[in-house]
Amino acid sequence: MSAPPRQKRLTPTTIAALKHQRPIVSLTAYTTPMARLMDAHCDLLLVGDSLGMVLYGLDTTVGVTLEMMIAHGQAVLRGVNRACVIIDMPFGSYQESREQAFRNAARIMKETGCDGIKLEGGTEMAETVAFLVERGIPVLGHVGLMPQQVNTSGGYRSKGHDEAEADKIRADATAIAKAGAFALVIEGTVEPLAREITQTLSVPTIGIGASPACDGQILVSDDMLGLFNDFKPRFVKHYAELAGVISKAVEDYATEVKARQFPGPEHTFQPRKS
């Protein structure tokens, strides 16, 4: 007997066609259980290199490896039936040359079954984006605040405050769109500029710390769920406060274990009566 047919997932082409139709709903996903919970509600799930900070406790995304991205991409794809799944290319896996970028992007797609890759960069990456797209690899661009470049760009600060910086972001967005990216993430960019870019480009923009006028929005799922209490970026809204819920659950568990209240009779196995 053959396996039941898998529901057809949304594709980069589907996502691109949503511009001027309705907002694109996107979140990051790193594991199978979370992907299953998000799948019905999200158009696009990004296996972001933010996993280095969220799951592994790294200070930046620079330490994330290709192997980490592939492993988590495989996990997410196991939990998805509907959403388009895009995987971040980690720092150092695509900047050296167009050939390096294609080799690693092709590996990601082959080993995970994802729908495309995301890479950071502007005018300097346009030729690479075109090279990938021409060879069958859908690309989600990323301009504005680029986390992989925090060591050379002044850290995690919003972009586009002065005209020179704004002009650079405009040029970056235009170049990546013209190179063939199916959509573009705009991160940490002043609202009027993100709005202007969205209205100018023919491809969808997905904002994070950008503008409500963007064609879609994305957040780091762990931020949105309130799993971190020590720092909350300005652009994050907590739709839940799971850090407190989890902490209380663990506290209650510990209390019951110490008091020998858990496991109770309903949680243990008794011999069958003959």
Swiss-Prot record:
Chain sites annotated for binding 3-methyl-2-oxobutanoate: D49, S50, D88, K118
Family note: Belongs to the PanB family.
NCBIfam families, per database record: panB (TIGR00222), PRK00311.1 (NF001452)
Residues the record lists as binding Mg(2+): D49, D88, E120
EC numbers: 2.1.2.11
Named cofactor requirement(s): Mg(2+)
Annotated protein name in UniProt: 3-methyl-2-oxobutanoate hydroxymethyltransferase
GO molecular function: 3-methyl-2-oxobutanoate hydroxymethyltransferase activity; magnesium ion binding
Catalytic site: E187 (proton acceptor)
Described function: Catalyzes the reversible reaction in which hydroxymethyl group from 5,10-methylenetetrahydrofolate is transferred onto alpha-ketoisovalerate to form ketopantoate.
UniProt subcellular location: Cytoplasm
Major site of localization recorded for this protein: cytoplasm
Residues that span the membrane, as ranges: none
GO CC entries: cytoplasm
Top-level taxon: Bacteria
